[in-house]
């Protein structure tokens, strides 16, 4: 046990809190620094409970935190049984006898409500949540706590923070959010024995194989003889690409591929309001928009501009407004919601026949043949939307990111400066706007799926951002904005398997008329007018434009939920790629070359008017981010197959650049495999077209392995 952490804890915490913290660290094998965190949390829970009585004179609160896990689980189950409550799948800190509800206490040093949002995403409204911060902020999902409780807790947290800062331990006791506790592992005899047994023949031990691999040096003649020996055993002849050149990929012909992403992007229109930290839940945001923005006045016209089932969509929109007005966010089952939600419409594969009926023929048991999707041509709208995603939006700060941990050396200072620079470029893009929309909206859908699988729920399609003006003026706290893009209805969602699907019906706002080729899957209504702010010289004027309501029925799966709710990974991957390049240049020169590398190092990003376009890394970041995000939203079996096969052509291109010989068994078969993946995925068709352009450019520069049709 570290004396440093224990002594500091004993200096300002109650002895009982220190004892509980030490036992918890020993029980769960946590790092010693957790003594202080656990002790503070336990003492706050005690302050929340102490000296408060119910109307009958008994203790109002039951403290669950601080007990052994087995005892705590038994106590919680006993309370659920005594008060006729559903058992919870997680342990809470406190039980309120008067309210008959469990309470979860959280403590954070973050200045925003991200910790509260993460807790609320896991727990929902199944219990009360109170998150106290060291700077006096309180986030909660219900009324309370009492004023006396708040004052006692905030006073204690301020005292604890001051004491820890004097000891230079305030940052030390907190690990960064993305860093796990380090657990030292030792290799036991059983592990070493299993490791030696798993090595391939002819090796006997792991150390023998490791020694061979470290000393191995390739012999070209020996490798060539092995290749010729393998060739004699394989029926397919090896073909060198100098004589058997790659042709261009044949793109499918037919109607243009439609828009398939779950939410509108370029055409989406948003209503904005100043964010209220006290009302940050999805349902509260939606109620505030309808109350303050008078969105209940949006009424779709009887006749749609395009699409099917207009009566069902209109009636469901009226039910949505009623659910928001009565604040339940629940839509009762009826013909319209069941039809659009697909409830009771699952087709039976084989008809059920009772024993009393006649035996049916073999023909009657045959299932109908699966219809393959219709091949679609490359969509012209895709390039325009790609360029739109690269450009800046009116707001910034769309993607919630973790705080930067304190830097320990000079290289980490470079990395922190670089990441802040890149984040400043990327956070204001339209692509970041769509990422933020996916993270919050799909995160809210996941919570509703988990907590209310049998109900039809209303969820906002929304995001959070910050004003550019506030950021540029250097104000201490930029104005946070809530942005509403539309409303989503979640149908029943009993997701028992990872590939389980559930239906969503989206109603999205737009000020653009629909493109019949792009928006084939949408039913579009005129729904009134809205005011758009436009710049005219130095002044800003308002112009009234038509408002359209884009309606669509689609589906999400558990896997797709996970992909879209964690879209910020695209952000991290993009920044990591550029960070590696910049830090490598700085390490080579042994000086800070971050800004120089960002501004001077070029990257090819595409083609315009027959010429390749290169941009500095600082701007090429945008293209990298859009590509990563589009992989996330358009990912399917077509895209996976295409990316897997196109790598072989890119490897041949790299070999050509290095003047090396390349060969394979069936170059024409490789191209046919790629073409099998080109059906109707817009991203696949876009990448195939880019690959053809790359082949043309390589051939112009003297590539030997490619031919132009």
From Swiss-Prot:
It holds the Pfam family Flu_PA. InterPro entries: INFV_PA, PA/PA-X, PA/PA-X_sf. It is an enzyme of class 3 (hydrolase). Its main location: host cell. A motif (Nuclear localization signal 1 (NLS1)) lies at residues 109-124. GO terms for molecular function: endonuclease activity; metal ion binding; RNA binding. Mn(2+) 2 binds at residues 65, 93. A motif (Nuclear localization signal 2 (NLS2)) lies at residues 166-228. Phosphorylated on serines and threonines by host kinases, including human casein kinase II. Its cofactor is Mn(2+). GO terms for cellular component: host cell cytoplasm; host cell nucleus. GO terms for biological process: cap snatching; DNA-templated transcription; symbiont-mediated suppression of host gene expression; symbiont-mediated suppression of host mRNA transcription via inhibition of RNA polymerase II activity; viral RNA genome replication; viral translational frameshifting. It is found in: Host cytoplasm; Host nucleus. Gene3D superfamilies: Influenza RNA-dependent RNA polymerase subunit PA, endonuclease domain. It comes from the Viruses. Transmembrane segments: none annotated. Its EC number is 3.1.-.-. Keywords: Cap snatching, Endonuclease, Eukaryotic host gene expression shutoff by virus, Eukaryotic host transcription shutoff by virus, Host cytoplasm, Host gene expression shutoff by virus, Host nucleus, Host-virus interaction, Hydrolase, Inhibition of host RNA polymerase II by virus, Manganese, Metal-binding, Nuclease, Phosphoprotein. Mn(2+) 1 binds at residues 41, 93, 104-105. Binds 2 manganese ions per subunit. Plays an essential role in viral RNA transcription and replication by forming the heterotrimeric polymerase complex together with PB1 and PB2 subunits. The complex transcribes viral mRNAs by using a unique mechanism called cap-snatching. It consists in the hijacking and cleavage of host capped pre-mRNAs. These short capped RNAs are then used as primers for viral mRNAs. The PB2 subunit is responsible for the binding of the 5' cap of cellular pre-mRNAs which are subsequently cleaved after 10-13 nucleotides by the PA subunit that carries the endonuclease activity. Influenza RNA polymerase is composed of three subunits: PB1, PB2 and PA. Interacts (via C-terminus) with PB1 (via N-terminus). Belongs to the influenza viruses PA family. This is Polymerase acidic protein. The gene is PA.
